[in-house]
């Protein structure tokens, strides 16, 4: 267990946990192949030449293949029409080899992201963005949960065990992280507060939390004196800021790490905390989708 300083916070190693989850997924794939006569399949669609998106798509392809799954990569030019993209999604919906469909965001401005997400078959929506899956999460039914908040919950439960009765503050209310994160914590019987840009005296709200999840996209906004001693801090932010050398940059989270680590009981670093969990949970969701679609039981506790 790594700590910051003599009495500082435990560092939550998301990279190590993600590696373990990916290994468990890979271990479960051969049994599915035998039962279903095929490998689980993940289709990733990229529109345009966005550099960051290309990196993410390559990482997802590599991880999918390493897990023993089929990776179906579809690239469209930035000039592709919305109609072309929707037609591709419909073809993937109908393709029995494909268990999960992921359309890499952001999309070019002439394409309606909401319409594209709504076209994905909810049972193949391994990103958990479809309104049907959002509704399933809200009412406690089985569906697909967005990868980042589910990864955060896994790290929290691994660190703290039973979360029942704990005070949790989620900073940020996006559909991708904040809202589903709050729903997951509520399902774990936490007392949940969602904070945002209009929250009055945000620092005071955060100070009462046993669990802080920061997902606002503002570099080092959450200061150390906001953190309750012993709290668990999950930093979802990934922000690029100027580095020490001219022309260089570095990655920081939404939490002032050194300050918070001096007070918290445990904290995720940036990088190496939440980030690696996202692709690992994507593989997990794809494996679950494959089992559900094929009518094959996934042994309880096999992948977490």
Curated annotation (Swiss-Prot):
SUPFAM superfamilies: Aminoacid dehydrogenase-like, N-terminal domain (SSF53223), NAD(P)-binding Rossmann-fold domains (SSF51735). GO terms for cellular component: cytosol. One of its GO terms (molecular function) is methylenetetrahydrofolate dehydrogenase (NADP+) activity. Pathway: One-carbon metabolism; tetrahydrofolate interconversion. GO terms for biological process: L-histidine biosynthetic process; methionine biosynthetic process; purine nucleotide biosynthetic process; tetrahydrofolate interconversion. Its EC number is 1.5.1.5, 3.5.4.9. It holds the Pfam family THF_DHG_CYH. It comes from the Bacteria. NADP(+) binds at residues 172-174, 197, 238. It catalyses: (6R)-5,10-methylene-5,6,7,8-tetrahydrofolate + NADP(+) = (6R)-5,10-methenyltetrahydrofolate + NADPH; (6R)-5,10-methenyltetrahydrofolate + H2O = (6R)-10-formyltetrahydrofolate + H(+). Disulfide bonds: none annotated. InterPro entries: Aminoacid_DH-like_N_sf, NAD(P)-bd_dom_sf, THF_DH/CycHdrlase, THF_DH/CycHdrlase_cat_dom, THF_DH/CycHdrlase_CS, THF_DH/CycHdrlase_NAD-bd_dom. The keyword Methyltransferase does not apply. NCBIfam families: PRK10792.1, PRK14186.1, PRK14188.1. Belongs to the tetrahydrofolate dehydrogenase/cyclohydrolase family. Catalyzes the oxidation of 5,10-methylenetetrahydrofolate to 5,10-methenyltetrahydrofolate and then the hydrolysis of 5,10-methenyltetrahydrofolate to 10-formyltetrahydrofolate. This is Bifunctional protein FolD 3.
